[in-house]
Amino acid sequence: MSAGPVRIARTEDLAAVRRLGVACGLEDSGRSDEQIEAAWGAFAGERLVGAIALERNEGLETVNWMAVDGDYRRRGIAGRLYAALEREALVRSITRLWVTARAPAFFLSQGYTAVPEGDERDILMGECPRCAQLGRGCEPQALTKRIDDSGPPDGSRSEGETWHDRD
């Protein structure tokens, strides 16, 4: 069972990120780790209990490998991991993020919107239409979000706080 604080930190252990993702039900696309630009882990002590990666996929800056161990869910870890990724994207002057969301509600709550039919959607959906998991607990959605540091539409936030830090 989960106990104690969980810290968010950059990680270079991409194999552990993949193992956690697969253990949480994500499909390993087999893409090269060279496409991963940065990754973060959520650590309970030394144990990796959550992860997320910023990946470049055919010219799209994508969120990938977002997973949280079942014993650690509903504690705001996904939001903290995503916030770290979005802050890094801003530092890198990335203006748009993309995701193939297996859990679209989380990303929709972060301001993502559906990607219309076209090349970007085709890239994001990739092998999904042929995947054995499709329709068996997996209903992925191609989503995108324009990012900047302006905060939520009503402009409310504390000094130095990005709007998604308040989960």
Give the residues covered by each predicted segment.
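Short amphipathic alpha-helix that is part of the acyltransferase structural core
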Residues: M1-G30, G41-F43, E139-A142, R146-D167
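A generic "binding-loop/recognition-motif" signal
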Residues: D13, G59, R102-A103
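Conserved beta-strand in the GNAT
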Residues: G41, R47-E55, L60-A67
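Conserved glycine-rich acetyl-CoA-binding loop
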Residues: R47, D69-R80, R92, S109
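Membrane-topology and secretion signals of cell-surface/extracellular proteins
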Residues: T62, L134-G135
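Conserved acetyl-CoA-binding loop-helix of GNAT-fold acetyltransferases
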Residues: R74-R87, V99
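Conserved GNAT acetyl-CoA-binding A-motif
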Residues: A89-R102
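Conserved active-site alpha-helix within GNAT-family acetyltransferase domains
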Residues: A101-P129, Q133
